[in-house]
């Protein structure tokens, strides 16, 4: 008697290609782009050029957009990059420029995915959007803090997520706090960027300051979790990726 036909078992799809990286600068936007094919890197660069030009044009029409630290009313005809920045800033209660780097990262990765990428990372000065078909370790740079060389393991996923970092002791970005690193995790990368800014602003010095800093973002829909490093103290809230050791050096950072 013949054996019944068996349904073929689909083998898990292997990640394709060895990742390549490219450093790309367009005026103040300085990014590191990672993908498995150069065409995806070009897609990211094209998106950055396009959305940055749109943003610059909008700022010329309303310079207040660039300088306000307060929530901003969204015009009906605002372009997508501007809308995302406004929505993120308003959700957190701060200005739209708090979300500029994360928004550009997200739009670039979206363009890479549209081109077919399953592995795509854009690091815009510590504000990172990614989609990955293999585990990825993202290092957290914490300046002179004794808590260093920490990495976060992002397991394979088929949708874009983000980790954005703010610091008061590292880098040129505006921060009113004393965090060596304040990182926020969200699938809304614009929101993660604005939230990291607010979290970093809230961090003072000492253990108690780290503990109470999370009030700046706790309870905001869309935020998965956060991590703060300040001096010899580290605090975590919410759902975080697995923490591991990583080789985190200053020269590895995409400086914006």
Curated annotation (Swiss-Prot):
InterPro entries: ApbE-like_sf (IPR003374), MA1715-like (IPR037456), UPF0280 (IPR007183)
UniProt-listed SUPFAM superfamilies: ApbE-like
Top-level taxon in the UniProt lineage: Archaea
Family membership noted in the UniProt record: Belongs to the UPF0280 family.
UniProt protein name: UPF0280 protein MM_2648
